[in-house]
A protein has these predicted regions:
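Acidic, Mg2+-coordinating catalytic module of metal-dependent nucleases/exonucleases
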Residues: 85-91, 96-97, 101-102, 133-192
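Short, glycine/acidic-enriched loop or turn micro-motifs at the edges of active sites
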Residues: 8-10, 120, 170
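Short coil/loop linkers at secondary-structure junctions
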Residues: 56, 108-110, 154, 185
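Conserved non-catalytic scaffold segment of RNase H-like nuclease domains
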Residues: 1-99, 147-156
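Short alpha-helix plus adjacent loop in nuclease-associated cores
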Residues: 115-137
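A short alpha->loop->secondary-structure connector
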Residues: 103-113
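Conserved protein kinase catalytic core
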Residues: 11-13, 123, 173
Length: 192
């Protein structure tokens, strides 16, 4: 099983590009991969996305990998894993972008159609612990930072940009605390 996070130049996989990918092997957490790439030629870049990940268009233009090379390196990394089970925090957009990229470059999709979602695991943990998850406008209010806080992981700085590998590691640590009752090498806080 592996925990993955991606950053994009926007939210539409047809118009926007994958720009970074971070992945952690859940059972061998020292085995990681972090890649950044140039914008796909002709793809759009939304300034709102920059505010999330902090990777400027100018910075991305200097990257040596293309989106196609990034996806190919990721698929090679995954091919070394015995399990192709994908884990992530609300991974649907990540799945959508990678699936579209595999189609675009005629790469085989080696994954199943089921994914383990941290949000769902956290909601289940709240209820199993006799607690109600926090709500906002009638919906669960459990982003990655809120789940990390629930797991006893110190909060990130409010000004800290998202980084695909940092977020994949944080997600892996949350999964480990919720499913196995213990953190992994990425932090020393104990779940309460």
């Amino acid at each position: 099983m592996f925990v993955i996070d991606l950053e994009f130049s926007g939210l539409d996989p047809e118009r926007h590009s994958i720009i970074s990918l971070g992945v952690v092997d859940f059972f061998q957490p020292s085995r990681t991969l972090y890649l950044e790439c140039r914008l796909r030629p002709g793809s759009a870049f939304d300034e709102e996305a920059f505010l999330v990940h902090g990777l400027s268009k100018e910075y991305l233009e200097k990257q040596s990998l293309s989106e196609q090379q990034l996806v190919l390196q990721f698929l090679a990394w995954v091919s070394q894993s015995p399990s192709k089970v994908w884990m992530g925090q609300s991974p649907w957009k990540d799945v959508e972008f990678l699936s579209r990229a595999c189609d675009r470059y005629s790469f085989d999709w080696p994954f199943g159609h089921r994914f383990i979602d941290l949000h769902s695991v956290a909601v289940g943990h709240y209820y199993a612990s006799g607690k109600n998850p926090p709500l906002k406008n009638g919906h669960t209010d459990l982003g990655l930072d809120r789940i990390a806080e629930y797991c006893g992981i110190p909060p990130r700085s409010a000004s800290e940009h998202h980084n695909a590998l940092t977020d994949a590691k944080l997600t892996a640590d949350c999964f480990s605390r919720l499913l196995l009752g213990k953190g992994i090498e990425f932090s020393s806080s104990k779940m309460e």
